């Protein structure tokens, strides 16, 4: 069902190591408003959508979110590439290194590991779409916060792209929500 394309949705070429930003951006991988949770949320909710249109939308967006996971992980790798132990210690990433070495692992910015408790799936298309719209808005706000924390255009560019995709996803969910409300789904 899935087809892997070996290019990112937006080119990422971060030239400067920035461990502080990596420490913050990891939240969009494994945090409550991050891309991993979004992908799993939508790919699970799709099964109980009442029609093929809803199933297709959640599948499309859930699959795109997996691409966003790849983008965030690429950013994390490029932001930390070549970091010394002392540099990791200086920004508080030594505790992360102690458990994961140089691997990328889904946590929030405080180091709390990803949990499926970050998202809900209740089998009700209206409730699920409401959850999905809220999730997209929270992700958008998080991207805006991250953008405000850097001046590096190599970081800002991908973050702006991801922010814009959150807005588009919100609008697509909103359209389906309104359609389902008109059809009388509860």
Which residues does each predicted region cover?
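Non-heme di-metal
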Residues: 1-186
